[in-house]
A protein has these predicted regions:
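Flavin (FAD/FMN) cofactor-binding and adjacent substrate-gating region
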Residues: 27-34, 56-130
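A structural preference for short, hydrophobic beta-strand core positions in alpha/beta folds
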Residues: 3, 68, 100, 137-140
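Helical element adjacent to the flavin cofactor pocket in flavoenzyme catalytic cores
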Residues: 89-94, 111-162, 166-167
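A non-catalytic, amphipathic alpha-helix used as a structural packing/dimerization or gating element
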Residues: 43-57, 86
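Glycine-rich active-site loop/strand segments that organize a redox cofactor
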Residues: 12, 16-47
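Glycine-rich FAD pyrophosphate-binding loop
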Residues: 1-16
Length: 173
């Protein structure tokens, strides 16, 4: 396995993250339930729950010292408690441990918040450093295209049996 990194490892979103590992991705569950249906929404939830568990398992199995800890995650509003309540209802219907609250760990008051229990936080750069020590990484290698097992980069092409995209923004349309 190799990693192609367009810049330097950890220089993008990883360095500027909130360090939360969470199934909370803005107000998505009510909309997803309504627009995509319950089955697809449940699949989305399931994938996110598996990812959360994978982080925990990887940290334990590889003994990665990255300050990994279980904690709650909050999504809040300063103006619309009803929207937050609808999101909580959808999340609970989809099997997520979530509750409406006005109490958070934030240093300011909110009109409403979703508390997602059993989420996690960690030091992402320590985590990434431990992973990077076990991988072959080509930094400053921008992927410009992918076609059926062939990856095009600004430094040449790579053949691959499988390709995983792990970027903050899509690298192509």
């Amino acid at each position: 396995m190799i990693v192609l990194e367009g810049n330097r490892v950890g220089s993008g979103q990883t360095a500027g993250t909130t360090a939360k590992i969470t199934i909370s991705h803005n107000l998505i569950y009510e909309k997803l339930f309504r627009e995509a249906g319950e089955e697809k929404a449940r699949k989305y939830v399931s994938a996110n729950k598996r990812a959360l568990k994978m982080y925990s398992r990887l940290v334990q199995e590889e003994q990665i010292d990255c300050d990994f800890r279980e904690c709650s995650s909050y999504l809040y509003s300063l103006t619309d408690a009803e929207q937050i309540k609808r999101e909580v209802e959808a999340a609970v219907r989809l099997g997520i441990e979530a509750e409406f609250t006005t109490k958070t760990e934030l240093p300011f008051s909110v009109i409403g918040s979703i508390c997602y229990q059993k989420q996690a936080a960690f030091h992402p750069l320590l985590f990434l450093k431990a992973l990077a020590e076990q991988l072959v990484i080509y930094e400053h290698t921008k992927v410009t295209g992918v076609e059926e097992g062939k990856i095009y980069t600004d430094h040449g092409n790579v053949l691959a049996d499988a390709v995983v995209f792990a970027s903050h923004h899509p690298i192509m349309n």
